[in-house]
Amino acid sequence: MKAGAVRIGWFLGVFFGALAAQAQENGGWECSQAKIRSAQNARLAARAAYPGDTLIDMKYLKLDLTIRPENKYIQGAARHIFTAKSGISEVSLDLTGQLKVSSVTSKGRKLTYSQASNKLKVSLPAKLNTGDSETIDVMYEGTPPTTAFGSFSFGTHGTAKAPVIWSLSEPYGAPDWWPCKDDPADKLDSTQVSITMDKSYVSVSNGTLMSVEINLAANTKTYVWKNRYPISHYLVSVACSNYASYDLTWEYGGKTMPVSNFVYPEVLTQSVKTQIDRTVDMLTFFSDTFGEYPFITEKYGHAMCGFGGGMEHQTVTSLGGFSESLIAHELAHQWFGDKITCKTWADIFMNEAFASYSEALWAEKRTGKSAYMSNINGHITRAKTVTEPVYISNPKDENLVFDYNLTYGKGAVVLHMLRGVLGDAAFFDVLKGFMASEYAYKSATINDFREFAEKRSGKELKYFFDQWVYGTGFPVYKINWLSAGANQLKIEAGQTGTKLFRMPMEVKITFKDGKEELRTITIDKATNVFEINDLTGGEVSEVTFDPNGWIMKTMTVGKLELLGNEPAADEKWAYPNPVNDILTIKVPENGLYELEIRDIRGGKVDLREVTKGKVDVSRLPAGKYFLRVLTAEKAVNGVFVKE
């Protein structure tokens, strides 16, 4: 193109900003670290049994464990009651090959079985038809596999090196210590776990403590715990050490529930007690927000274990410390993860996104909106770095399932944005309603939640989940606005990228007298033009887009100015205005400039190439036009009127 020429371009450009942020250690971060270790991930994924035997429906587990920490050995007796989902003569349970089965019986009758490739296959005493039930007892023993993931671990704590034993089965670790059906969707109706150890130990599991049996001859104690609520296999847990007890009581809706905390003696200081005390207020807040605590007839509590972070075992969280955000995160899991569990590990959003978002809700409750936004903005910064969808493409990759930036961070941001789309009243009604829905004490997929949210709120949300949960990326907005006279505002909002996003965006309009008005526009195309002619505050002085930060995005905003009706050639850079035929563009020196012109509806105006800053606009229809001239240093915006 010739020197001094003016070329026609697009009105909208894309400007990307780079943001750097440090990952903050919060409850979600601690939770993710507890659930993922890189050293053994490939090995664990290779032997993952998921989704277990699809032809049976598990009903009941009675698990009797004897644990010998001195040689890291366990002996187990697992009674399973299950029903057949079709005609079967054989059942398959998932159990590591490092634990050897010594017998399998049914009502005292020995059954034929084989153990290979981390599977226990049992021939049933008779063929089962659909709906028939059966009971089998599996006797096994051995040393659980030692993995960095820590499905069943032996450790010590304190200067005295007191032993501590704990389980952490999520996602694929339960077969490392008991024979099970390795599928989070198939919940047991109830469980009983008995733990026998040296009498110096306190042993903790799910539900209510039924008895403590002392065997003086063997110098042992047996703790018997009964859980009467549906429970996913990976939430069955044990934790054993020389715990000191710190017991609280929570009252809600006329009901009383124990909050039982099992803490290392050397850790149980007044400061730690103060941290734990927050649990009671959190129980009330989350019950008000999501519905009554799901296991109120049993308990809630914590058991300290030898890992950093936490694990939301049903009714008793296992954790390594008592930070406020970790307590909030794991408690929220009792609703999102335990009461309603992800149906597949690809749907881990149903667990971790909600628990991470609940941290922000608790921060908002405790400290205010600024604390909430600080939490969310941290997640937004990290979420912008991810390239995978929130719906997990490879659920056998624990690095991906428990990726903090993705599953926890972006997951929380998705819920924040959904709150913005629905509004507070509808959003929290959806959450509380979902907890009381057909999925209560069962499992659900992300799509189940979407369909429920649509039905409950009356809003179509497929577009939202498609782009934010099943898709990747985020919108990049370039927005310009013009105060077009009293009570009039014109906005041109564009987005670029490999895909376009559809999102409602709040617009805060500030008038010269200081009054404000809030409107909402929906940006869903590459170029969007909005003319607002029914304002009530007079002349607009400022416009703020997405003032409450509901959208994960990058955005640049510019203000257009009217060029004036009586321009002087030495004062104005584009004149005359209004113009009939030739518009003069005043530039500081010869060179290459980009001239961008669009009509007020956002359509690109096609002009011939011109020189010497003269633009022939005689063929343009009468009306207002956006004008922009770009130099190497800056861009100058304006509006001219064609008569």
Language-model regions, residue ranges each:
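Zinc-dependent metallopeptidase catalytic helix centered on the HExxH motif
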Residues: 317-373, 431
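N-terminal, polar/Ser/Thr-rich
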Residues: 23-75, 159-163, 462-463, 467
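Hydrophobic helix-coil surface modules that form long, contiguous segments used
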Residues: 76, 167-171, 181-328, 357
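Glycine/proline-rich low-complexity spacer/linker segments in large multi-domain proteins
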Residues: 53, 130, 139-191, 249, ...
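Amphipathic alpha-helical substructures
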Residues: 404-491
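Acidic/His/Gly-enriched intrinsically disordered linker/tail segments
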Residues: 352-417, 421, 439
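A surface-exposed beta-strand-loop module
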Residues: 24-30, 96-157, 531-537, 550
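C-terminal outer-membrane/trafficking sorting elements
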Residues: 19, 568-575, 579-643
